[in-house]
Amino acid sequence: MTVNRLGLVVHGGRSEAVAAARTVREWCAEHAVRCTDIDVWHDHGRRNSQEEVEAAGDPDLVVTLGGDGTFLRGARLAAADDALVLGIDLGRVGFLTEVPAAAVRSALDAVREDRLSIDSRMLLTLRASRRLEVPEELEAWAKYGRGPLLPPPQVRPDCEVDADWGIPLNVTALNDVVLEKLARDRQVSVGVYVSGRLLASYSADALLVATPTGSTAYSFAAGGPVVSPRAEALVFTPVAPHMTFNRSVVTAPDEPIALRVLECSGSAAVSIDGQLRGVLDPGDWIGVYAAPRRLRAVRLGPMDFYGRLRERMNLTDAPAAVADGSPAPLWSVTTPPPGDLAHLTLLTAPIAQ
């Protein structure tokens, strides 16, 4: 792949990220690639997605140096510009980053020499009953202990605004969209609709809609299912609902999920990939849909999602079932699958650590 412009998204609060950034800049200088930095820790400019693309130099490739939070910032930038994104792993429990920091130079060489595969990930987008805004009194609270607060999403100029379908927002989510309570002493009351039909009215601390990628993030912590990132689905999960039905609901990508704040409720915050982006009042609603655009993430080898799930979540075996030694794979990793299984995705080579 020809790389002319590289956008470098760095968590400047981590010394190892700063050191890896120097390696990336050196590589760019050696190969005459223009490199533009965005420091998600120290850069306090509030930019919408298009302004961030311009600030990053309209990159062909976005490289993130940090954990999953930094990757989400880079993914937002890459999705807005249809660029590739490569995540360098400097986090502790993340699932999104691909390459260890020590291998950053060889990873960039692999991208340049086209020794890569593209992992296409589903994204979410929104429509809303009105424009989203963050009240000024909430901004200091939202920024506490974090980097800069992202601005409310703009209205997409290329989409039709309709009284029935609401205002199209120029925003995407790789992990999740969350509607959560603002008041400490009361839950938020929300009507949840699937494909326009009422599923149930909830009283809960929060309600979230996740992608398969986001199923191992907030949704997982709230008791939601683990979904393969290769699947196409929307995962709805209530957080601490005060009702008998507390299960997640998994819908098809063409079955949108809408959340309407009920008149008996207080206001609710809208967070997109962990960032507060607006507040809804009683009567307001958001609709969450599968986005027409996709995230294109760089993969340098086969993705062992379930091996990473076992490792990162520190999964343990039942004492009565555990065997001595390391567990062997069920299928051989040295031969290809037989013809009747050729349509399946099976790892046929050891995963490099």
Protein language model regions, located:
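Catalytic, metal-anchored helix/loop core of enzyme active sites in primary metabolism
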Residues: 16-19, 26-30, 201, 212, ...
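ATP/nucleoside-binding phosphotransfer catalytic cores, i.e., glycine-rich phosphate-binding loops
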Residues: 179, 195-198, 244-353
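Short, acidic/small-residue loops that bind anionic groups at enzyme active sites
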Residues: 82-98
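Short glycine-rich anion-binding loops that position phosphate/pyrophosphate groups of nucleotides
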Residues: 68-70, 93, 213-215
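Gly/Ser/Thr-rich active-site loops/lids in small-molecule metabolic enzymes
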Residues: 187, 197-245
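Short aromatic-centered micro-motifs
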Residues: 192, 214, 270
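Catalytic core of DAGKc-family lipid kinases
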Residues: 95-205
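N-terminal glycine-/serine-/threonine-rich phosphate-binding loop
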Residues: 1-81, 114
